[in-house]
Amino acid sequence: MEEGLQRCFVLHRRPYSESSLILDVFSEEYGRLSIISKGARSKRSNLKGVLQAFTPLLMKWSGKGSMRTLRQAETISLAIPLTGINLYSALYINELVVRVIEQETPYPALFLDYLTALTELAQTKNPEPALRRFELALLSSLGYGVDFLHCAGSGEMVSPEMTYRYREQKGFMASIRHDPLMSFKGDELIAISERRFITPEQLKAAKRFTRIALKPYLGGKPLKSRELFLPRTRSILK
């Protein structure tokens, strides 16, 4: 079966045999796929410079099962310009998608969130808000439903000044005790819900929450992007 041209991004690529590539691709309509590009590394390949991360692509493939075969690929536009810490942050996002979402499952809304995150990273000096927004979008796509705006105990709206303790599978409970990991101020929960972070404390709280929420999906295996780039991006990816 051969599909028509689909909007895609290459998340990861690795050499295969003498001249081919295996691509981990994020497609708008088909989700994450493994695709082999035969001869892509040969000197005469017309795909040299095309199958790159962060480049908007149109791709066509054929086949079924766990590995498809690339039939056509062309760029929609130039690669999204990412450098320095923003490039490392984008690599982190790519690894999150590879590690967390299942293959062969469509995530059209998350694909647009991914494109938005890359665009934001290309336009900002501080990548943290874009990272937090994408992590929250990813959790939402996975069905990780959390009510940030209501106390799980009373059902009342959270108060910006009050402290709430997060309990997995239950939500946020009003608490007079402070837990460095699980306690959040009401204004932080509101900021997370709106995905709009005004203060450094709100950003730190959002990072804390996404780390807690993503941990079950990532398991005990560390992210390679953190290991590679943590010395240069300690404030962002730790």
From Swiss-Prot:
Domain of life: Bacteria
Family the UniProt entry places it in: Belongs to the RecO family.
GO biological process: DNA recombination; double-strand break repair
Pfam family, one: RecO_C
The entry's keywords: DNA damage, DNA recombination, DNA repair
Protein name, per record: DNA repair protein RecO
Its biological purpose: Involved in DNA repair and RecF pathway recombination.
A GO CC term attached to the entry: bacterial nucleoid
Encoding gene, per UniProt annotation: recO
